Regions:
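Periplasmic N-terminal accessory/gating domains of Gram-negative outer-membrane beta-barrel systems
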Residues: 1-77, 84-87, 107-108, 127
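Outer-membrane beta-barrel channels and translocator barrels
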Residues: 15, 93, 133-137, 142, ...
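Hydrophobic, lipid-facing positions within transmembrane beta-strands of outer-membrane proteins
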Residues: 34, 86, 99, 122-126, ...
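Extracytoplasmic loops and strand-loop junctions of Gram-negative outer membrane beta-barrel proteins
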Residues: 51, 71-72, 106-111, 201-207, ...
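Short strand-turn segments of transmembrane beta-barrel domains in outer membranes
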Residues: 68-76, 87-133, 151-153, 165, ...
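Transmembrane beta-barrel strands of outer-membrane/channel proteins
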Residues: 101-109, 149-155, 235-241, 292-296, ...
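Transmembrane beta-barrel wall of Gram-negative outer-membrane proteins
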Residues: 120-246, 264-277
């Protein structure tokens, strides 16, 4: 069971992606115009194929490249492996006998107030096809070597439109918050976010979500070589590139400049050899056919801060904090050379103050802490140590200001994650068929190898992790080896020092 949608039908549809077209087939559960599920399975149970290649990465193709899209819901052939949901298979167009060219341009403008709508959708599609080498045999006309190339270039000013628009801070208010991110708390307990006192006059209504553009490119090509009357060699491939900023409601009012950047690219190539064999009408074995295919797919994906990219330690960096400490002593009885001695013994270091020098990587957060030190100038209790800074709603490297009413992120709050993936797939398949008497026989094999690798980091948490690990191997005093202080005459001064005890098992750097 299932269905097939032809290129003529696809051309009449408003949305022409593989998933959107497949969702029009009966039996496919649709969600937001895309494939939700097939036969009640999760999305992972649906397997996509493009020109016989099992899809890894993006399924996007140029809109003019589709020849047909087939959906198999039940009775899945063995050649598709262990798919538990359904199969969605797209076949791209091949070369034609005569040269052809098509250009298509769609546009709704460049954004809010600059076109038909606020979202700025623009698409340019170009396709070329035709013969490269024609047969010179008048009895067997046609192309010996033909090609088909299609491309789509898409730009959207807002890739995730909202139904009714949204409120955002005015540029003037953003500038004000940049220079004045905090104010003194009326309760005398530290500072408050200035953004928590936003009023309607500080906001403006927009239909287009800010800083959510998307650039996408899709290419597809096919080269057919008619090596003989009964054999055919085909080469093809596709490439997709996407670069966009993700919409985040939390960031939408104040912090849209920090929307995450998503980058992905998928390219796949294949070679296919097909041969058919002649058979007489009275032959017991007819319609003998086989096909051998090899393919390769490369998929890369990344999300990151668009400015910092792979500079992971800049994500959470606010500035340089220097802790000033002094030695602490307490009266205790210590045994030295078999004698108990009352002396002032070293008890460790105490923090006197933490000074701050702003960094340049995150200007808003740097201003936040500069303002903090300005508001509490001379009041050392608010920056005696890192705990006192945090208790008064100050920031350390890796920290972000508290949200506004638990709804919106504060201006300057950084993207906290970084992720990069590199996936590769190699496939080889062979299939053959023949009619033997009144029976149809099909057989073949398939080999598939995948290599999936990735790296991820909670970038702002790196600073918290480093603070917890630094000097973790010298936290205890070596009280077994006291160091009495003597004057120049060898007289005990009543003071005993200790070195820190090294713990190899706690060493983390």
């Amino acid at each position: 069971s299932g269905g097939t949608v032809t290129s003529e039908e696809i051309e009449k549809m408003p949305e022409k992606s593989i998933a959107a077209v497949a969702s029009t087939v009966g039996g496919v559960f649709s969600r937001d115009g895309e494939v939700g599920s097939i036969r009640g399975q999760r999305s992972s149970g649906t397997v996509y194929y493009i020109d016989g290649i099992k899809v890894t990465g993006s399924t996007a193709l140029p809109q003019s490249a589709y020849d047909q899209i087939s959906v198999i819901l039940g009775g899945i052939p063995a050649q598709y492996g262990d798919a538990t949901g359904g199969i969605i298979s797209a076949t791209t167009k091949g070369p034609s006998r005569v040269f052809g060219m098509g250009i298509e341009f769609q546009s709704s403008g460049l954004g809010e107030g600059k076109g038909l709508d606020a979202y700025g959708y623009n698409r340019l599609g170009v396709n070329l096809n035709g013969p490269l080498i024609q047969s010179k045999n008048p009895d067997k006309p046609g192309a010996i070597l033909g090609y088909f190339i299609a491309s789509d270039f898409i730009y959207q000013a807002d890739n995730r439109p909202t139904a009714k628009g949204t409120y955002v801070a005015t540029p003037e208010y953003i500038d004000y918050l940049t220079q004045n991110p905090i104010r003194l708390s009326d309760e005398g307990t530290g500072v408050w976010n200035e953004a928590s006192f936003v009023t309607r006059d500080d906001l403006m209504f927009v239909k287009q979500n800010l800083n959510t553009p998307k650039l996408e490119m899709a290419l597809s090509g096919k080269l057919d070589v008619k090596t003989s009357e009964m054999t055919n060699l085909s080469f093809g491939g596709s490439f997709n590139y996407s670069n966009y900023r993700g919409f985040n409601f939390t960031n939408s009012m104040f912090n849209y400049d920090k929307n995450v950047q998503y980058l992905s690219s998928t390219w796949r190539v294949y070679g296919r050899f097909t041969q058919r064999f002649r058979s007489s009408e009275d032959a017991k074995i007819k319609n003998v056919f086989y096909e051998l295919q090899a393919d390769y797919t490369q998929y890369n994906y990344k999300y990151q801060d668009a400015h910092f990219q792979d500079d992971l330690f800049s994500y959470g960096y606010i500035g340089q904090y220097n802790t000033h400490r002094s030695r602490s002593y307490e009266m205790a009885t210590v045994n030295i050379d078999g004698k108990d001695v009352d002396a002032m013994t070293f008890a460790g270091y105490v923090e006197d103050s933490v000074t701050y020098r702003p960094g340049t990587q995150n200007q808003v957060l740097a201003n936040y802490m500069s303002k903090y030190y300005e508001l509490f100038a001379g009041e050392t209790d608010y920056y005696r140590n890192t705990n006192s800074i945090l208790a008064a709603s100050g920031l350390l490297n890796g920290y972000a200001p508290s949200s506004v009413y638990n709804l919106f992120g504060t201006l300057g709050s950084n993207q906290s994650g970084y992720y990069i993936a590199d996936n590769q797939q190699i496939g080889v398949s062979f299939k053959a068929s023949a009619d033997i008497g009144g029976h149809a026989l099909q057989f073949g094999f398939q080999f598939e190898q995948k290599i999936n690798s990735y790296f991820s980091a909670s970038t702002t948490s790196l600073w918290t992790l480093m603070r917890s690990r630094v000097n973790s191997h010298i936290t205890e005093l070596d009280t077994e080896n006291p160091i009495p202080l003597m004057d120049e005459n060898g007289v005990f001064l009543g003071v005993i020092d200790y070195n820190y005890l090294y713990s190899a098992t706690s060493q983390s750097t």
